[in-house]
């Protein structure tokens, strides 16, 4: 009996070496599909990448989305004051169907899918975010 117990305890010591998953905190699990904004004016690209991760489960990042934005004559990506139309065109270039709607808060609270929303507390500084009801 003692040999069996020793063998069992010995086996338990090496069990963590064979674990093939990492333990994640609740915050890590909650934010695993979140794409953080890397540049001052790239909230639209980060929000679109987050939305794609949530809906299509593709690992799209912000830089990948920025490649689909309109470029200026020098080939630079313009992220200054991005509109819904530009985000819609980028999504369509990536192969997604998209549409823009204006709705009041009451209708917004009834929607049960993630949405990309433009916040305009100050019209000079619009901001894009993803909301999940």
Sequence positions of predicted segments:
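Sec-dependent N-terminal signal peptides
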Residues: 6-10
């Amino acid at each position: 009996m003692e040999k069996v117990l020793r063998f069992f305890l010995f086996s338990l010591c090496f069990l963590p070496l064979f674990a093939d998953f990492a333990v994640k905190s609740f915050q890590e699990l909650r934010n695993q599909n979140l794409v953080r904004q890397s540049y001052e004016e790239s909230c639209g690209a980060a929000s679109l990448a987050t939305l794609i991760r949530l809906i299509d489960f593709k690992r799209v990042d912000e830089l990948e989305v920025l490649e689909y934005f309109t470029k200026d004559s020098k080939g630079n990506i313009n992220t200054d004051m991005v509109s819904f139309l530009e985000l819609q065109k980028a999504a369509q270039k990536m192969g997604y169907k998209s549409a823009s709607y204006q709705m009041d808060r009451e209708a917004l609270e009834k929607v049960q899918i993630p949405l990309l929303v433009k916040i305009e507390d100050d019209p000079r500084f619009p901001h894009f975010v993803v909301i999940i009801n």
